[in-house]
Regions:
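Conserved beta-strand
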Residues: 7-10, 17-31, 59, 342-361, ...
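Coupling and communication elements adjacent to P-loop NTPase active sites across diverse families
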Residues: 1-13, 91-148, 228-349, 541
Length: 541
């Protein structure tokens, strides 16, 4: 029987009472499925439920076959050896003991049928570009991106029937991403992948769109899905226009009917006052008129209510594509203004900047390089979080740095309170007015940061830094699109389009870098920082 995932009447609620799923029914069959949806829709939660990391409040999750799960945030014990991280340490030790002449039965039981486990492990590492990593090395010696691939290699060695990947390309350089793409393409079983990586999602066979606790299916990859979505959106917007026209018509008809009824009432009162007919006749006529008027009014009110309901349904069918709108005139930097200077800079972990490097005016700089090259270390040094090993670094304008870990937020404070910390001179009304531009309106601004989804948390952190006082004229972002859905990436792009200061972005997401108007490309490679041409970027990232 083909391996599959069957979810029946699934309900799940977080400890604080926030519902995620109520009666969800869905099945994933053979092939590669891209699970998409806005941040906070429950994509990662669904993967964790399927993987058995979370238990449903109600309903069932059944998986035919073994499950392999790559979480969004990969953490490995740095003291482990690579073979331990791969799950083959015991078998490898038994093999070596047998090769050394120890024929104890326990060693043969440990090896089982996996006599080629070491060769398979080395092959799996090689396929993912980790052929240089020895099995006896410790995990602490590999970079963050390599640890993701190491965890994936461990899963591939297990040969699970079902593979669940949650944002697998986060923290991977372009070279590592291509290795992962190849592994995804060659996967023979059931795969469900959550990602904002368009190139990865274009490798899937179908898209499952999770929205409002329900899943809609689209055949084909992400590009095909986007085309289908555009057609749906246009149709939904047409239905809104039709429903609005009908609603206006019903309002006019109700108003006209009310005017006519008022005229009749005045005429009837006039007849009564003038007593032109017997009282009993006029009374009967008045009661009949009132009954008719009541029925007429109720009919029009019902029609109006039905039109209102159709309009609400039509509006609900249109996707909410809110965009961040930022107007920050104090972030503007004059073209000739010196923003940042580096002189013979030596970083704590070995990288260096030979000679001098200068940023002027509202330049937009991309910092690229392989995993472990030192990009984050360089940004932290510029931000003043790390002391330089040698040389000098100086920011000549107010600077703000948004790290990957988003620890600029205090999880126990609300969104509004976090922003107020960075703008102590701003009134509460001013803070909330500014937050509305970052889509935190009303009660959303009163959410605690710890309860936010990945995209919301990033948006709140970005708001805190961009709304800070003094206004940042140099903004540095470290892998900003990690953990963001497509809508959030579009929102970030819009926000950065409105930003008038200088920008330095470390990212492996080349389409995103191109969309924010990068003007200079800096490559950190083999311990040296150098400027490269845009044409060379795709070969160097």
């Amino acid at each position: 029987m083909s391996a599959s995932i069957t979810v029946t009447s699934l309900s799940f609620t977080w400890p604080d009472g926030s519902p995620v799923f109520e009666g969800l029914d869905v099945a994933f069959g053979p092939g590669r499925t891209g699970l998409v949806g806005v941040n906070g829709s429950g994509k990662s939660t669904l993967l964790r439920l399927v993987a058995g990391e979370l238990a449903p409040a109600d309903g069932t999750v059944r998986v035919a076959g073994e499950v392999g799960y790559l979480p969004q945030n990969v953490t490995l014990d740095t003291a482990l050896r690579v073979d331990e991280a791969l799950g083959i340490a015991a078998q490898r030790a038994a093999l070596h003991a047998i090769e050394a002449g120890d024929v104890s039965e326990k060693h043969f039981e440990t090896v089982g049928d996996d006599w080629d486990v070491e060769e398979r492990a080395l092959a799996a590492l090689g396929e993912l570009g980790l052929g240089h990593i020895e099995l006896d090395r410790t995990v602490g010696e590999v970079s963050g991106g390599e640890s993701v691939l190491l965890r994936l290699a461990a899963l591939l060695l297990r040969r699970p029937d079902v593979l669940l990947l949650d944002e697998p390309t986060n923290n991977l350089d372009l070279y590592a991403r291509k290795r992962l793409y190849a592994a995804v393409q060659s996967w023979p079983g059931v795969m469900v992948v959550v990602s904002h990586d368009r190139e990865l999602l274009d490798l899937v066979d179908q898209i499952a769109d999770l929205r409002s606790g329900e899943i809609a299916w689209y055949g084909g990859n992400y590009s095909v899905y986007e085309e289908a979505l555009e057609i749906e959106q246009e149709a939904a917007e047409r239905m809104v226009r039709v429903a609005e026209a009908d609603f206006r018509k019903q309002k006019r008809e109700l108003t006209d009917a009310q005017v006519k009824l008022a005229r009749r009432k005045r005429y009837g009162q006039k007849m009564w006052d003038q007593k032109r007919e017997p009282k009993i006749v006029m009374g009967a006529r008045k009661r009949a008129a009132q009954e008719s008027a009541g029925k007429h009014r109720i009919m029009h009110e019902e029609k109006l209510a039905e039109a209102r309901e159709r309009l609400d349904e039509a509006v609900e069918a249109v996707r909410d594509d809110d965009e961040i709108r930022v107007d920050l005139p104090y972030t503007a930097v004059p073209p000739g203004r010196t923003v940042l200077t580096l002189q013979d800079l030596g970083l704590r972990y070995g990288a260096r900047v030979k000679g001098g490097l200068e940023l002027r005016g509202p330049e937009r700089v991309a910092l690229i390089g392989r995993n472990g090259a030192g990009k984050t270390t360089l940004l932290r040094t510029i931000a003043g979080e790390l002391a330089p090993g040698a040389g000098e670094v100086r920011a000549h304008v107010p600077l703000r740095f948004l790290p990957q870990r988003l620890d600029v937020l205090d999880g126990e404070r609300t969104v509004a309170e976090n922003v107020a910390r960075y703008a102590p001179g701003a009134t509460n009304n001013r803070v909330r007015a500014r937050l509305a531009r970052f889509l935190f309106r009303g009660a959303r601004a009163d959410q605690k940061a710890a309860t936010l989804s990945g995209g919301e948390r990033f948006r709140a952190a970005l708001a805190a830094l961009m709304l800070a006082e003094p206004a940042p004229q140099l903004l540095m972002l470290d892998e900003p699109t990690n953990n963001l859905d497509m809508a959030s990436v579009r929102q970030l792009t819009t926000a950065l389009e409105s930003y008038e200061g200088a920008l330095v972005v470390a990212s492996h997401d080349l389409p995103f870098l191109e969309s924010v108007g990068i003007t200079r490309w800096l490559l950190l490679e083999e311990g040296e920082l150098r400027e490269i041409t845009p044409e060379a970027v795709w070969f160097s990232a």
